[in-house]
C-alpha cells in the first residue's frame, strides 16, 4: 500500500490523510491548547478524495496517522460514451474507463489530469 506515517502536527490544509480507511483531503485543521496534565489535541476535517464523504478525526498532536501517497497522472481521452470516458495513460499506454464529472466537457484527444490510489481513479 503506498502510504506513510506522519505525526498529526505535521498535517496541513490541502494535504491528504487516511480517515476511516479512505484517503481524504484536509479542509480544516485546528488545535486545542494543552490542559494541565494532557497534550494538545488536533481536530482534522476533510472530504473523501474518491467518494466526497465528509469525515473528521480528533487525535493528540503527537499521534501518528497514515498519509496516502496519491499519484497525479496524465491521460488522453480516447472516446466518450454518455457519462463514461475511455482514458489512455500517457506513461504506460494502459487504457481504462472512468466516469466523467458532470461539470466537465470532454472530447476525444483531450489531455486530462487524474488522481490514482490503489486502483481508484478520479479526473481532476
From Swiss-Prot:
Any GO MF annotation of the entry: translation initiation factor activity
UniProt modified residues of type Hypusine: 36
Keywords assigned by UniProt, alphabetized: Cytoplasm, Hypusine, Initiation factor, Protein biosynthesis
Alphabetical list of Pfam families matching this protein: IF5A-like_N (PF21485)
Domain of life where this protein originates: Archaea
GO BP term, example: positive regulation of translational elongation
Record's protein name: Translation initiation factor 5A
Biological source species: Haloquadratum walsbyi (strain DSM 16790 / HBSQ001)
Gene name of the encoded protein: eif5a
